Amino acid sequence: MAEAHQAVAFQFTVTPDGIDLRLSHEALKQICLSGLHSWKKKFIRFKNGVITGVYPASPSSWLIVVVGVMSTMYAKIDPSLGIIAKINRTLDTTGYMSSQTKNIVSGVLFGTGLWVALIITMRYSLKVLLSYHGWMFAEHGKMSRATRIWMCMVKIFSGRKPMLYSFQTSLPRLPVPAVKDTVNRYLESVRPLMKDEDFKRMTALAQDFAVNLGPRLQWYLKLKSWWATNYVSDWWEEYVYLRGRGPLMVNSNYYAMDLLYVIPTHLQAATAGNGIHAILLYRHKLDREEIKPILFLGSTVPLCSAQWERMFNTCRIPGEETDTIQHLRDSKHIVVFHKGRYFKVWLYHDGRLLKPREIEQHIQRILDDPSEPHAGEAKLAALTAGERVPWAKCRQAYFGRGKNKQSLDAVEKAAFFVTLDETEQGYREEDPDASMDSYAKSLLHGRCSDRWFDKSFTFIVFKNGKMGMNAEHSWADAPVVGHLWEYVMSTDCFQLGYAEDGHCKGDTNPNIPYPTRLQWDIPEECQDVIETSLNTANILASDVDFHSFPFHAFGKGLIKKCRTSPDAFVQLALQLAHYKDMGKFCLTYEASMTRLFREGRTETVRSCSSESCNFVLAMVDPTQTVKQKLRLFKIASEKHQHLYRLAMTGSGIDRHLFCLYVVSKYLAVDSPFLKEVLSEPWRLSTSQTPQQQVELFDLERNPEYVSSGGGFGPVADDGYGVSYILVGENLINFHISSKFSSPETDSHRFGKHLKQAMNDIMALFGFSSNSRKEFH
C-alpha cells in the first residue's frame, strides 16, 4: 500500500559496495512536525499547570509583590518585621556575595514567600466561602443581604479569567452526614412505600444500625474523608461501574441525539467531516483549558471540572474481576467502523489538524472502499456489548500479541471511536413515534456489533446525515458529555456550516494519506466467543421497549408562570403517570449532581415522598377540589426542591449508605439494614438533561434548532427509565425505556399517561389549550 511506504522515514539495503541509504523527505518532514506538535502541547500543559497552580493569583502578581517588597526596602522600610534580615544573615557566610546582592536575593525570597502565603490564604478563604450553601435554601427570587455580601466575597477571592481547572483546589470536600440524619431521611423516604408492619420492622433495623454498627463504620468513613479528595467517587466508580460484570450496552451506556428537526446536510461523509472536526476543536480547547468552568448563581459558584480530564483518548479495559480505565495524554488518530471493517484515520497533516473537507475526504474513501471484512471482524465489537468476563478472557487469550494486539491498541488508544451507520434515522413528521423510537434504539445499542461500547464515547453518523453519540458511563456523567455535544451541534451548524452542494466547506487535499485498514487474525475459538456475546447482546437489545417523543403542549416558560420549579413539575407528573400506569407508588431515583464539591459526581433524589403521594392521590380522587389539589401540589413541589437541594449540598441518603456498606464489606461485618437498603429496586429511574451553553443556540431566531436530548436503558427489569430535557421555553423532550419481557410495563402506555399527567397538572393553574397556544 502506498501509505505504508510513505510512513517509512528511511530504508537501507546492504550491497557489495556498502550500505545504500534512502531517505523519505516527506516522512522526515511529518516526523519533525509531529515532534514539534508534541512539544508545543507539552509546553502548553506546563504553562497551564503553572497558571492553575497559583490561582486565584496570577504569575504576573509575583512580580508585583516582589517589586513592592524591593520598593519598601529601597525606601528604608522593613515590611518583613525582621525576616529579610534573618534571610540576609543566613545566605552567604563565605563572603562571596556582596551586601547588595544579598539584599536583592533576600527581598526576592521574602517576596516569593509572601506571594505563596497570599495564594494559600486566598485559596483557603475561597474554600471556606464555597462551603456555605445557605443561598441554595433561600426563597426563589429573594436574596438576603448576607448572601449578597457572601457573593461579593466569593468574587473577590475567585480571581480573574479562571481556566477549566482553576477552582479545583479551592472546592470544598464532600461532607459526611451524621448517621442518624441519613437513617431518619431514609425512613422518611420509604414511609409511603411500606405497609405499617414492614415500616415498623425497617425502623427497628434502622435504629439498631444507627446505635450499634453505624458509628463504627462512620468512624472509618470520616477517616477516609479526611484523607481522600472525595469519600464517594473512587468507590462509586469502582464498585458501581468497573466491577459490574454485566453488559455495558443498555445497562450502563447512554446516548445523545442530534437536533430534533434540522439536518444540515444529507451527505454522510460531510456530516462526519464537520462533526469530527468540531469534536477535535473541543479537544483542542480542552487541552488548553480554554473551556470555561461552569458557574452557578450569577457566575459566582464554580462546579468541579475533574470529569473533563478523561473525555478523550480513554477506553475501558475489561478484566475478569474488575475493569480498568486506560487514559492517554494524547492521541493523534481515530478509528472508524463501516460495514464490519475498521480503519485508522490520522487527524494531523503537515503539523496541523485536518480541516473538515479533508476529514470528509477520508470518510468518503472509507465509504467507497469495496473490501470485505476479515473472518470474525464484522462482529468483533459485540465483545464490548456482552458479558465482561468472556471479553476479558478472550482479550487476554487472542489479542495480546501480533496484528490483533496492534489493531486493538489502535482502537483502544484512539481519541474516540466513529461508526458510519448504514441506516437512516431521525425525526420524521409523517411517523414521529416510530422514527424517534428507532432513532433512540439505534443510538442505545445499534446492531450490537457496530459500536465500541468500551470507548469513552462513540460518534455515530447515519446514512442520511443524522448523527448521535453513545457514551460509556464510568469515566464521567451525562452533563459532561452533554457539554461536548452542545458544542458539536452548535459548531456544526453555526460555525463550520456546509457548501451549497452539501459538502464541507473548503477544498480536498490529494496529499493526505489514505486511511489504514486494521488487520485482524481471529481464530475460530475467538469467533465462537464473539457469537456468544452477540447473542447475549441481541437478546438484551431486542427486549428494550423505547419511546421517545417531543412534548409540544407547553414548556418551562409556562411552568415558570405557575411559579413552580420546572423540574419539580415534571417529577410530580412522572409520579402521577406512574400511579396511573401501575396503580401503585414505587421507589424513584432522580439523578442530582454533587459537583459543588471537589471530584463530586452524583447523588440520588428520592422523588417519591409522602407529599408527592398525597398530591397524586388527590389528583385521582374526584371529590378533591382544584384548590385542594393546588395546595398539595405546592407542598409536594417545595418538598421536592428541598430534597434536591439536600442532595446537591452533600446531605443525600444513598451515597452515604453505599459507602457505609463498602466499609462493612472491608471489615467483614454484616448489616441487615444496609443489605436490605441496597437491594431495593429503583422501578422508576429519572434524569434531567441540563442545557449548559444556552448562548450557543439562539432559539428565538432559530426555533427549529432544538435539541432532542438523550436517554438510557431501564434500570429495573420491571421498571421504567425516563430522561427529559427542557428545551427553550416551549418544548420538553422525553425518552422512556422499559423491557418487553415485563408484563407490567409498556413505554408507549407510560408515555400517554405522562402526557395526560402534564396536561392535568397544568389545568390546575387555569391554563386552557388556547391560553397555552397564546403563550407560544
Curated annotation (Swiss-Prot):
(R)-carnitine binds at residues 589, 602. The modification N-acetylalanine is found at residue 2. GO terms for biological process: carnitine metabolic process; fatty acid beta-oxidation; fatty acid metabolic process. Pathway: Lipid metabolism; fatty acid beta-oxidation. The modification Phosphothreonine is found at residues 588, 604. The active site is at 473 (proton acceptor). Residues 2-47, 123-776 are cytoplasmic. Its EC number is 2.3.1.21, 2.3.1.-. GO terms for molecular function: carnitine O-palmitoyltransferase activity. The keyword ATP-binding does not apply. It catalyses: (R)-carnitine + hexadecanoyl-CoA = O-hexadecanoyl-(R)-carnitine + CoA; succinyl-CoA + L-lysyl-[protein] = N(6)-succinyl-L-lysyl-[protein] + CoA + H(+). Keywords: Acetylation, Acyltransferase, Fatty acid metabolism, Lipid metabolism, Membrane, Mitochondrion, Mitochondrion outer membrane, Nitration, Phosphoprotein, Transferase, Transmembrane, Transmembrane helix, Transport. The modification 3'-nitrotyrosine is found at residues 282, 589. It is found in: Mitochondrion outer membrane. The chain crosses the membrane at residues 48-73, 103-122. PANTHER family: CARNITINE O-ACYLTRANSFERASE, CARNITINE O-PALMITOYLTRANSFERASE 1, LIVER ISOFORM. Belongs to the carnitine/choline acetyltransferase family. Catalyzes the transfer of the acyl group of long-chain fatty acid-CoA conjugates onto carnitine, an essential step for the mitochondrial uptake of long-chain fatty acids and their subsequent beta-oxidation in the mitochondrion. Also possesses a lysine succinyltransferase activity that can regulate enzymatic activity of substrate proteins such as ENO1 and metabolism independent of its classical carnitine O-palmitoyltransferase activity. Plays an important role in hepatic triglyceride metabolism. This is Carnitine O-palmitoyltransferase 1, liver isoform. The gene is CPT1A.
